[in-house]
Amino acid sequence: MKASSLAFSLLSAAFYLLWTPSTGLKTLNLGSCVIATNLQEIRNGFSEIRGSVQAKDGNIDIRILRRTESLQDTKPANRCCLLRHLLRLYLDRVFKNYQTPDHYTLRKISSLANSFLTIKKDLRLCHAHMTCHCGEEAMKKYSQILSHFEKLEPQAAVVKALGELDILLQWMEETE
């Protein structure tokens, strides 16, 4: 009798956790790879530094992340790979190289980087389980984005990419 009530309690707790809405938790459907992340927390962290970052951007007529050309038209099967490469770009070249004397901004960027590392870890698991295939379309789109990034001076590219983080976050929110 005790075993059945314990099993029922555990089952009830599991259902409660699965069906209770989590604040800010978003399921990203990236082809065969499905992960959950707190995009609202990332967006809130970025919104606190967005104005100061974008104020440093002197290249207002150039875009690195183009909604139609590079992100929005990405087929579901290629989203995982494209996101994996974009996270690597932000982790290896943007967050690490952003220069500012403002310690508050640097702490926020560190927090954003930690959030991206968590997502990247989940994407690595998908890649290990062969559910994050890198097709020609994903590689072509990433090459276009990287080309736009590399056309700018290194620090200008870092500022531009960080200032466009909201475009990437919007795309991630819209993956369904």
Swiss-Prot record:
Subcellular location: Secreted
One Pfam family this sequence matches: IL10
Domain of life of the native organism: Eukaryota
PROSITE patterns tied to this protein: INTERLEUKIN_10
Signal peptide span: 1-24
Chief localization: secreted
InterPro entries linked to this entry: 4_helix_cytokine-like_core (IPR009079), IL-10/19/20/24/26 (IPR020443), IL-10_CS (IPR020423), IL-20 (IPR020442)
GO molecular function, one term: cytokine activity
Disulfide-bond pairs as recorded: C33-C126, C80-C132, C81-C134
Any Gene Ontology biological process: positive regulation of osteoclast differentiation
Induction: Up-regulated by UV-B irradiation in epithelial keratinocytes.
This protein's UniProt keywords: Cytokine, Disulfide bond, Secreted, Signal
Gene Ontology CC: extracellular region; extracellular space
Tissue specificity annotation: Expressed in most tissues and five major cell types: epithelial cells (primarily skin, buccal mucosa, tongue, nasal mucosa, lung, ureter, breast, prostate, fallopian tube, and adrenal gland), myoepithelial cells (mainly prostate), endothelial cells (mainly in small vessels or capillaries), macrophages, and skeletal muscle. Isoform 2 was detected in the lung tissue only.
Family of the protein in this entry: Belongs to the IL-10 family.
Quaternary organization: Forms a 1:1:1 heterotrimeric complex with its primary high-affinity heterodimeric receptor IL20RA/IL20RB.
Function summary: Pro-inflammatory and angiogenic cytokine mainly secreted by monocytes and skin keratinocytes that plays crucial roles in immune responses, regulation of inflammatory responses, hemopoiesis, as well as epidermal cell and keratinocyte differentiation. Enhances tissue remodeling and wound-healing activities and restores the homeostasis of epithelial layers during infection and inflammatory responses to maintain tissue integrity. Affects multiple actin-mediated functions in activated neutrophils leading to inhibition of phagocytosis, granule exocytosis, and migration.
Name assigned to this protein: Interleukin-20
Organism: Homo sapiens
Encoding gene, per UniProt annotation: IL20
